[in-house]
């Protein structure tokens, strides 16, 4: 009002000065300045309250989360229990709701910036599932061997796991009753660890076709996590396989192990045990490291599928005689994993010690594919006893001898593996004063059994 006072002074000294016009002009300037400030404050408050109103509406009608397993934002209606991804269609639907129901107009970019922020808490749905399972008292730690043993608690303390195991009749029943709980506990341990792979074995069911092997293995993923399992073929050399490992609780390899060559089989063993996997999500710029989430299972029609003659400690094969699939479907997998969680907490040893690993090697022999080298070695040679005469032959000499009777291509490496597996004695000898060479104590079966085969083919 300082300008108004000055105008009064001017009026006193100049009687002909018109006060009204000047005073109105001054008041108008001050009013305009006030309106500008009001508009600025209003715009500042409106911008803030608009996003707050959007968040209030979204929180009232929906629940949002950022799925750390799938690396995406998800939401569900407050009245519906199923989470779905937030994509372009969902964003446009939410924009339409805000406009129609709340008269709030906003851009897709702004809506994305709200939802893909701390507004949506980061959640690992699989770990959340296991943490939410009820606590079960299975007895004291000594009942399950503590950390120095792997004895499964009696049926008085466990129910769901023994019931599930009893649905399957296998040829090696005692090992099935021990190894299935080990594998189930390892599933829980592996899912709860973001830095290491805790399940180093693949549970494999072999046998005749139509025995519900694949169906039973699919049941091992609980219904609450049905979206986190993969059943089908995998190719160790492809990048999609790494995504399967990082985004699924169970990977079920369906009748493919027989078709794997030795290189792929070795790659698969590495994939089963790798601590982390690296891959790039669609539309992301960078390759990132992800926890190894998956536990492996597989089904095989027939029994022979292992191509490595030295055996494998990564596979737990069982020949199926029958499966009561209807009874298996009726068993609550929530109860099964609640018991597995309790076993893990009690200190149950879900890993395999040295003696058990040696036993795995022995038991895997029944599931190995017999190579041509092994077949010919068993047909044409034998191990000498202490009082029998024998020859000292190199691998090359053995292959040369067999080449007289068969045109089948044979590999020195596979013959060496066959000799080792069959238990032939390997020794170092010098011939004619030359360098030492490796030879095997061996006896030829005479006449050579291949002669009859060659004669019958002529």
Protein language model features and the residues they cover:
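Conserved AAA+/SF3 P-loop NTPase catalytic/coupling segment centered on the Walker-B
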Residues: 249-272, 306-311
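N-terminal nucleic-acid engagement/recognition segments and initiation subdomains in replication
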Residues: 1-156, 170, 174, 178, ...
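P-loop NTPase catalytic core of nucleic-acid-dependent motor ATPases
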Residues: 119-246
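Long, low-complexity, charged/polar intrinsically disordered regions in eukaryotic proteins
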Residues: 331-363
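Conserved catalytic/switch belt of AAA+ P-loop NTPases
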Residues: 265-288
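A short helix-turn-beta junction within AAA+ P-loop NTPase domains corresponding to the substrate/partner-engaging
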Residues: 306-324
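AAA+/SF3 P-loop NTPase mechanochemical coupling elements
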Residues: 241-246, 281-299
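DNA transaction DNA-binding modules
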Residues: 351-458
